Amino acid sequence: MIQQRTLKNTIRATGVGLHSGDKVYMTLRPAPVNHGIVFRRVDLDPVVEVPAKAELVTEVTLCTGLTCNDAKIQTVEHLMSALAGLGVDNIIVELSSAELPIMDGSAGPFVFLLQSAGIVEQDAPKRFIRVLKTVEVTEGDKVARFSPYEGYKLGFTIQFDHPMIPAKQSRQEIEFSTLAYTKEISRARTFGFMRDLEYMRERNLGLGGSMDNAIVLDEFRVLNEDGLRYADEFVRHKILDAIGDLYLAGGQVLGAYEGFKSGHALNNKLVRALMADATAWEWVSFDSPATPDPVEYATPAYA
């Protein structure tokens, strides 16, 4: 039986927004059964709540952003990814600004925060979105696809003409579980190229970016003194992003995801296409002890 999960305790963190450069205070609070993931802009009067739902995505340029009642929540994908990785269904995320803190550019610090707060099971079965038929979206040569699958599997291929991103390190696939996520995916950082810096600055993007929270490349090499955490950290981060983007479906997907040069825009388009076709998916729960669990979540960590 897989039950819903929330936090045991409230926990707080401070950081800077990757794109805004603004300092932000974040508070993660427990939430009741079937509450879902809800962001709360506590700097606004009155306070505005923004549910983590794919249909509220309005920003897909270099991040995933939500808008509800004119209130924006930017760069949600890394926290959403960590919540998916640890199986957290219900949580309140309070923010003092419009953008989540970027932390170190990965989901690792969010995983640490969630584990430090403690994760508890709730008295209700976890609800999954089971893919019943293949759904695919494209944009030029970019592809994102869901296919039926017993568990949750993600594959991703990137293509960059750069000596640090050779073809042999441009493809990765994982069978999703908490262990695989925390060890193989969660610490992969976001990345950017020096050549794109001017473009980003003109659009007020990346204002909080630095080598402390991103991998930075020039035309030939990685500029960060500490180098890479994984040889294929770039494609692993794309999987990290996809896990977060797909969790905006409103539940954990059961199926196989395949991305080819996909990004936030195409991932959101895929989720919307899936949810728009009532014959392509169904809600399922696993509340019988005799039923094998389709996804392996770690035993809750009680803080």
Curated annotation (Swiss-Prot):
<dbReference type="GO" id="GO:0009245">
    <property type="term" value="P:lipid A biosynthetic process"/>
</dbReference>
<keyword id="KW-0443">Lipid metabolism</keyword>
<keyword id="KW-0479">Metal-binding</keyword>
<comment type="function">
    <text>Catalyzes the hydrolysis of UDP-3-O-myristoyl-N-acetylglucosamine to form UDP-3-O-myristoylglucosamine and acetate, the committed step in lipid A biosynthesis.</text>
</comment>
<dbReference type="InterPro" id="IPR015870">
    <property type="entry name" value="UDP-acyl_N-AcGlcN_deAcase_N"/>
</dbReference>
<dbReference type="InterPro" id="IPR011334">
    <property type="entry name" value="UDP-acyl_GlcNac_deAcase_C"/>
</dbReference>
<keyword id="KW-0441">Lipid A biosynthesis</keyword>
<comment type="pathway">
    <text>Glycolipid biosynthesis; lipid IV(A) biosynthesis; lipid IV(A) from (3R)-3-hydroxytetradecanoyl-[acyl-carrier-protein] and UDP-N-acetyl-alpha-D-glucosamine: step 2/6.</text>
</comment>
<keyword id="KW-0378">Hydrolase</keyword>
<dbReference type="GO" id="GO:0103117">
    <property type="term" value="F:UDP-3-O-acyl-N-acetylglucosamine deacetylase activity"/>
</dbReference>
<dbReference type="Pfam" id="PF03331">
    <property type="entry name" value="LpxC"/>
</dbReference>
<feature type="binding site">
    <location>
        <position position="241"/>
    </location>
    <ligand>
        <name>Zn(2+)</name>
    </ligand>
</feature>
<protein>
    <recommendedName>
        <fullName>UDP-3-O-acyl-N-acetylglucosamine deacetylase</fullName>
        <ecNumber>3.5.1.108</ecNumber>
    </recommendedName>
</protein>
<dbReference type="InterPro" id="IPR004463">
    <property type="entry name" value="UDP-acyl_GlcNac_deAcase"/>
</dbReference>
<dbReference type="GO" id="GO:0046872">
    <property type="term" value="F:metal ion binding"/>
</dbReference>
<comment type="similarity">
    <text>Belongs to the LpxC family.</text>
</comment>
<feature type="binding site">
    <location>
        <position position="78"/>
    </location>
    <ligand>
        <name>Zn(2+)</name>
    </ligand>
</feature>
<feature type="binding site">
    <location>
        <position position="237"/>
    </location>
    <ligand>
        <name>Zn(2+)</name>
    </ligand>
</feature>
<dbReference type="GO" id="GO:0016020">
    <property type="term" value="C:membrane"/>
</dbReference>
<keyword id="KW-0444">Lipid biosynthesis</keyword>
<keyword id="KW-0862">Zinc</keyword>
<dbReference type="InterPro" id="IPR020568">
    <property type="entry name" value="Ribosomal_Su5_D2-typ_SF"/>
</dbReference>
<feature type="active site" description="Proton donor">
    <location>
        <position position="264"/>
    </location>
</feature>
